[in-house]
């Protein structure tokens, strides 16, 4: 079951919204959260609309790799939390980004030990709602290059003359992978500093977001 936090305010860039998310997660993590029964929460901090928060404790140190598949969308895969054979852990707390909006997504997380031996697979399916605010890609045109296209998970921002001032994410198939809401003012860039994202969310305000979307 994927849980949803009922926030008392809609503005994600307030300490109240962020504290509510942390409070709920802290409470829910107190249960026995194993790889067979992980905690799954939809976009707890409100910053990546189609993301899923994952929390579980394993019986031995492991690292995790994920794959997201959805009909008509590009398959997205990666290693969670910068994990590797040198970064195994017992406590697994991740934000899985980039599920395809309005489509049934199957998320598969594979866990490995420091010797790169497979130990466990966790799999679940969910259909994130389609956001009206997300601009549609009307046409996808194949280019002439014979070079293989790299894994696509792109951010689009910097609208000068548009009310659609959020940060939007797409894959190589032009399928929406969610959005990061902004407060009515476009951002020009996303900086990565010490593993955090830094971007403007209002005309005179910056957000610093960690790997959990907080």
Report each predicted region and the residues it spans:
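Surface-exposed, short loops/turns at beta-strand junctions within beta-sandwich domains
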Residues: 96-104
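Surface-exposed loop/edge segments in extracytoplasmic proteins
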Residues: 72-83, 118-120, 176-178
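Proline/serine/threonine-rich low-complexity linkers at boundaries of modular beta-sandwich domains
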Residues: 14-35
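A short, sequence-level motif marking secondary-structure junctions
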Residues: 82-84, 127-128
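Aromatic sugar-binding surface patches on proteins
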Residues: 85-93
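Histidine-/acidic-rich catalytic cores in large beta-rich domains
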Residues: 3-14, 38-53, 57-63, 91-92, ...
